[in-house]
Structures are given as structure tokens and as C-alpha cells.
């Protein structure tokens, strides 16, 4: 019978590695979410201009990031693009700065952290802009026509009528993309970033407690995902009653398919 030795993971140096890895995953996820949101909004703005060049730029961005593996992208940013930065910038980032330490003793001004947050962010932005665009397309054309008839300008109609409904339609897929970013942060271990997966593998090499280490790592990812999902749902678009929008779906069945036909 296989006996589990939790003391080999939940005490001493392995425990410190687990805590450090979890906090590092937390911070790089938040940084990646910020980068992804910023770029998704910029890309959405370009697409809404209707300009052919701007639309083409968005199309190339989405195609490039959605159709290449994230691990390859992270390696590109870390091993190739990083060396294109001016030498003074690289020297400044590699130096130790007291103000660059986040709570939990996580250093954010490092090549590994910056490349991981950037890579996760730009990768996720390509998916986010499509989710938001789909949500906006799901808003009926009558909503815009009614807003214009009521005297709203085109921008006011978009800001106060179309965008809130579009975000409500797309919010659950958006939350899913943010959660996916959190899970994909484990790939950053491939460039030597000491997040949770990296630290779990380090414990495996340190004392061969692989099963216990990966069990704890899995539990922490699950905990983080549940908490993050709940927070994002609460922060999402609210209905007039102040409650989060909920998309109503019918249970899947072959009878429903035949009925729709």
C-alpha cells in the first residue's frame, strides 16, 4: 500500500517553495490579466473604427497569437525578443531594486516575470477581443436603433446601451479566458520562472515526494481558480437588481436538437 508522507512537502524548505510558488503564480496571473485586458480594449477599439488597415492589424494579431503554442511564444519573448531591448534597459531590470518586491517577497522586475506576464497577456488578449466582439454582435440591432431614436449619439449609445449588454453576453467566456490564463501560467516554468509548477517539480527533485507535491499543487490551482472565478463573477456586469447577469441555457439532449430542427 502506498503511504503518503506529507511532512516531506508541508514542512521546512519544501513548504517555503510551495508558498513562494503560489504567491508568484498569483501575482503573474494578476499582471497577465491586466495586460490582456488593456490589449483587448485597444484591439476592440481598432476593430470598431471600421478602418480596413486597423481591422487587418487586429486580424493578424488574433491569428498570430491564437494559432501558435503559448510555450513557443514565451520562449520567443524570453530568449529572443528580450535581447532586442536596449542594453541600458536590460541592465536596469537585472539590478536589484527594493521597490520591485511585491508582497510575499515576489520580485516583479525580472526578465522571467516580465516575459511571463507579457506573454500570457498578449496571448489571452487575442481570445478576449473575440469574446467581447461576439458578445456585442449578440446585441440586437434594434437596441442601437432605439437608442439613436431616443437622441443618443453613436458613442453614447455604444457606451451606455450596447457595451453593457455585450459584456453581459460575453462575461462568462471572458471569465473562462482569465481562468485559462491562470492555468497556462504553469507553462512559464519552461523559461525558468519560479511559479507553482516550477517549485513543485523542484520538490520532486529535492526529496522525491512527487505525488504529495503535485497533489498540493493541484489543490492550490483548484483553490485559486474557484476563488478567482467567484470574484470575477461578482465584479461582472450587474442587472438592474444588482445581481450578476446569468445566461440561461437549456440542458443538452437529442430531443432538443430534433425540436430545434
Regions from the PLM with identified roles:
Residues 1-261:
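Transmembrane alpha-helices and adjacent helix-loop boundaries
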Amino acid at each position: 500500500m502506498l503511504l503518503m508522507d506529507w511532512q516531506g512537502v508541508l514542512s521546512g524548505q519544501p513548504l517555503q517553495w510551495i508558498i513562494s510558488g503560489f504567491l508568484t503564480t498569483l501575482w503573474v496571473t494578476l499582471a497577465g490579466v491586466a495586460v490582456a485586458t488593456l490589449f483587448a480594449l485597444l484591439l476592440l477599439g481598432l476593430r470598431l473604427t471600421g478602418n480596413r488597415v486597423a481591422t487587418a492589424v487586429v486580424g493578424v494579431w488574433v491569428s498570430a497569437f491564437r494559432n501558435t503554442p503559448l510555450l513557443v511564444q514565451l520562449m520567443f519573448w524570453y530568449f529572443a525578443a528580450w535581447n532586442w531591448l536596449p542594453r541600458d534597459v536590460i541592465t536596469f531590470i537585472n539590478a536589484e531594486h527594493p521597490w520591485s518586491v511585491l508582497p510575499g517577497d515576489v520580485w516583479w522586475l525580472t526578465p522571467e516575470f516580465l516575459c511571463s506576464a507579457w506573454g500570457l497577456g498578449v496571448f489571452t488578449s487575442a481570445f478576449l477581443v473575440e469574446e467581447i466582439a461576439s458578445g456585442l454582435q449578440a446585441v440586437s440591432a434594434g437596441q442601437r436603433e432605439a437608442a439613436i431614436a431616443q437622441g443618443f449619439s453613436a458613442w453614447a449609445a455604444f457606451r451606455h446601451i450596447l457595451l453593457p449588454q455585450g459584456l453581459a453576453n460575453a462575461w462568462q467566456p471572458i471569465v473562462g479566458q482569465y481562468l485559462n490564463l491562470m492555468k497556462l501560467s504553469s507553462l512559464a516554468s519552461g523559461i525558468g520562472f519560479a511559479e507553482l509548477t516550477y517549485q513543485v517539480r523542484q520538490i520532486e527533485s529535492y526529496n522525491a515526494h512527487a505525488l504529495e507535491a503535485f497533489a498540493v499543487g493541484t489543490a492550490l490551482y483548484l483553490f485559486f481558480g474557484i476563488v478567482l472565478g467567484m470574484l470575477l463573477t461578482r465584479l461582472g456586469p450587474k442587472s438592474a437588481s444588482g445581481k450578476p447577469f446569468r445566461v440561461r441555457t437549456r440542458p443538452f439532449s437529442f430531443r432538443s436538437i430534433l425540436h430545434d430542427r
